[in-house]
C-alpha cells in the first residue's frame, strides 16, 4: 500500500453529524443531504468533502458512534443551519489512496494498523479522515488520512 505524508494546517469546516453504527445507509444518506446543503450554499463546486468517524467502534457502543461529513471553508464564510462549524486539527498525516469500493475500504480498515507499524509510523490521538474531491469521486477513488506524529 502506497503512503504519502502530508502536513495540514488547522482547518475550519462546516459539517453534518450522524450518530449510530458506521457503514450503514444512514452515513450514505448523511453524505447526500450534506452535498445538497453544500450546493445550496455555494460551497460544493471544486470542494474537498471530508468523512470523519469520530469514535473507535471497538470502544464506543455502535449506537453512539459519531460520523461527520464536512467541507473545508475559509474563516469568513457564514455557515447556515442545519450545518455546524468545527475545526480539524492540523498536523502530519499518512495519506492512503484507495479504490472507493466497499471491499477496498473494508480491506484498508483491516490492515491499517499493520501498515502504520510496517512503515515505522506512530498514530496521534485524532480522528482518521476520509477525503474526497470531485476528480477522485469521478474516478471511484478516495483518500484516507491517518494522523501521525
UniProtKB/Swiss-Prot annotation:
The record ties this protein, via InterPro entries, to: AraC_E-bd, DNA_gyrase_inhibitor, GyrI-like, Reg_factor_effector_dom_sf
Entries under PANTHER family matching the protein: TRANSCRIPTIONAL REGULATOR YGIV-RELATED (PTHR40055:SF1)
Under what name is this protein listed?
Answer: SPbeta prophage-derived putative transcriptional regulator YosT
- Coiled coil region boundaries: none
Question: What Pfam families does the entry give?
Answer: GyrI-like (PF06445)
